[in-house]
Amino acid sequence: KLCKTYEEARDLCDEAQNDERIAIIGGGYIGVELAEGYNKSDHEVILFHKKETLLDRHIEPEIADKITNLLEDKGIQVKTGTIVKSFEDGANDTLIVKTADEAFEVDMAVICTGLLPQADLLQGKVDQLTNGAIVVNDYMETSNPDIFAAGDAASVKHNGLQTDVYMPLASQAVRQGALAGINVLDKRLRSIGTQSTTGMLIFGRTLACSGVTLAMALDAGINATKVAYKGSYRPDFMPNAHKVEIELVYDRNSRKVLGVQLWSKHDVSQAADTISALMHYHGTIDELSFVDMLFSPNFDQPFNYLNLVGQLAVKQENGYLRT
């Protein structure tokens, strides 16, 4: 079974009602969220991912390990660094999922290994990335000004990497579709690119991300490093002062913030949006460390957790936390 659309997800839920053991191939957002869903419906779940850590395009290994541990604590088998080689028919309408070293008998397998752009119609007619994604300018025009493209078929400018990338996200598709409609008759509004801001709620924990990981920054030739923060999101005398864990990636030369990932039982999703806006305007760790943010014991510490992770980055570079 494939899982790409809402309707396909509903069909998968309906068809799994009489199944017991389900394999999920692909440990991105869809795979992890499906693993949670099937676990909550009392299925035995095995999650396969070819990379060494889950959600490797979005988060640092340290946070990926926490997600893996959470899934395993819930009874989900997580097989990272594992490539599914083949599927074979098993006894009693079961399916055998084969890797290089093992075989797993399941009732159903769900494949959610990512998207490829469906752009064959324009192959050879417009500029495309190596994976086939249609290259568009800031107005959603292709190299043929009479043809516009948007969403999962189109590229997008990644502001952190300063290059066109393939980033099939619903939020990006909505923005590109709106821009294409606005600009189809006249160039009225430009795209301002993306920081690739994403998030999910998994077993009561919030994961929120924006920008690049350290590995992505280093691969792009940026002199980058990262800093980690862990602390209560609000004063400990308040009830449910949940811990917030943050990984912050920044450029050591320019001191610009390049990426952030947050993990908490508290809803920290809007913090990723805050950092996205900061990165869009080339904000630095110095600015982040003291940027004005509200304080109330109901909401945060006197220094917001985003201030505090910025201050840790400044300390890492300068040798002091704050003066």
Model segments located where?
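FAD-site-proximal beta/loop scaffold in flavoenzymes
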Residues: 1-19, 103-179, 278
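Conserved SAM/SAH-binding loop
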Residues: 6, 81-85, 100-101
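Rossmann-like dinucleotide-binding cores of NAD(P)H-dependent redox enzymes
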Residues: 23, 29-86, 169-172, 195-215
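Conserved beta-strand-loop-beta-strand element in the redox core of flavoprotein oxidoreductases
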Residues: 88-103
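Flexible, glycine-rich terminal cap/loop adjacent to redox cofactors
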Residues: 113, 206-210, 220-323
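A short alpha-helix-loop-beta-strand transition element characteristic
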Residues: 128-131, 187-198, 223, 227
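A conserved FAD-binding loop/helix module that cradles the flavin
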Residues: 136, 150-212, 300-320
